[in-house]
A protein has these predicted regions:
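Glycine- and acidic/polar-rich repeat regions and solenoidal domains
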Residues: 17-18, 44-49, 63-85, 93-289
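Beta-solenoid repeat scaffold
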Residues: 2-41, 48-59, 80-85
Length: 289
C-alpha cells in the first residue's frame, strides 16, 4: 500500500527470484530496504524485478551469483513496467555466469521517470552491457530517467562488441527522444569495449562524470541533440584511453576536461566521424550543427 516500508533482515538469500510490484504515490512511496545496508546478500541464481509506481529498493548486495534468466535487475515484471521507481544504495559485484559468452546485463531500465543512484556496479566479466536504457516500447520513450552518483568499477577488455558499460537505445531508436540524464558518476577502468557509454538515441545529457583510465570513449553513436558537458576524462597515459566520439547532428559538447589520454583512431580524445553518403541510421550520419 502507499507509504508502506518493508525491511529485509540481515542474511544470505540464495536462488531468489524477487518480484516486487506496487502502487505508491509521489507523497507516499513504497520502500523496500535492507535493515542494514550491505548485509542483505543476494546470491546464487537470483534476479530482481521492480514494477508499478513509486517503488524504492535500497541496500541490497548481489554477490557470488548469476542471473539464470534475463538480467540481474529489470525495471519491469512481465509486461508491467516501472514508473517513478528507484534503485539506490545497492551493489552488484561479480555477478557473472560460468561462461563469458553468456550475455546479460546488470540493470535494464524500462518505463519512465526511474532512477538508479548511489549504486556500485563492478566486476562484470561476461558479454552484455552493464546498464541499458530500453526504448523498444512506446511506454519507454521520453523517459527522463536519472542515472547518477553511481560507481562503475573495473571491467576488463572483453574482445568484441556488446561489452559497453552503458547504452541508451539502439540504432532503431536513433531519432527517438530518450531524455535520459547521466550525471555525477565515476567510471573507473571500464574497458569492456571501445564504447564505454554508447548513446543511440536523441536528447540525452551526459554531464559531470569522471572517466578514469577507461579504454574507450563516450560515443554519440546514433541520434541527435545530445549534450556532453563538464565531464573529466583522465587517461594517465594508458593505452586506448579516449574521450568523445561524435556522429549525427545537433549535439552540444562543451566544458569537458581531457587529460593524459593516449588513444588513437576510434579511441581518440575527440573523434568527429566521416559520414557515409545517404547513410542509414545504423551507419554514420553526417556531423552537422
Amino acid at each position: 500500500q502507499p507509504g508502506d516500508q518493508i525491511y529485509i533482515k540481515d542474511g544470505q538469500y540464495k536462488d531468489m527470484q524477487l518480484k516486487w510490484t506496487g502502487k505508491g504515490t509521489e507523497k507516499a512511496s513504497i520502500k523496500i530496504e535492507a535493515l542494514n545496508p550491505g548485509k542483505v546478500k543476494i546470491e546464487g541464481g537470483s534476479t530482481l524485478r521492480i514494477a508499478g509506481e513509486w517503488m524504492s529498493v535500497s541496500g541490497l548486495h548481489f554477490t557470488d551469483g548469476y542471473a539464470p534468466k534475463g538480467s540481474v535487475v529489470e525495471f519491469r515484471n512481465g509486461q508491467e513496467l516501472a514508473n517513478h521507481c528507484r534503485l539506490t544504495n545497492c551493489v552488484i559485484d561479480g555477478f557473472n555466469p560460468s561462461r563469458r559468452d553468456q550475455a546479460y546485463s546488470y540493470i535494464l531500465l524500462y518505463g519512465r521517470h526511474n532512477r538508479v543512484d548511489h549504486c556500485s556496479l563492478t566486476g562484470k566479466l561476461n558479454l552484455g552491457v552493464t546498464l541499458i536504457v530500453i526504448l523498444n516500447d512506446e511506454r519507454c520513450l521520453e523517459n527522463h530517467h536519472q542515472i547518477d552518483h553511481n560507481y562503475f568499477g573495473e571491467r576488463p577488455v572483453y574482445g568484441s562488441n556488446g561489452a559497453e558499460t552503458m547504452r541508451v537505445g539502439t540504432s532503431q531508436q536513433a531519432y527517438s527522444s530518450s531524455n535520459t540524464v547521466i550525471e555525477n558518476n565515476l567510471f573507473e577502468r571500464c574497458s569492456g569495449e571501445v564504447e564505454v557509454i554508447s548513446i543511440k538515441s536523441s536528447d540525452n545529457v551526459i554531464r559531470n562524470n569522471i572517466l578514469l583510465e577507461c579504454e574507450g570513449v563516450v560515443a554519440l553513436r546514433h541520434g541527435d541533440r545530445n549534450t556532453v558537458n563538464n565531464n573529466l576524462f583522465i587517461g594517465n597515459g594508458l593505452r586506448n584511453t579516449g574521450g568523445i566520439r561524435v556522429v549525427n547532428a545537433g549535439h552540444q559538447i562543451y566544458d569537458n576536461t581531457l587529460v593524459g589520454l593516449a588513444g588513437t583512431r576510434f579511441f581518440s580524445a575527440l573523434g568527429v566521424m566521416d559520414a557515409v553518403p545517404n547513410s542509414l541510421p545504423n551507419r554514420y550520419c553526417q556531423v552537422v550543427d
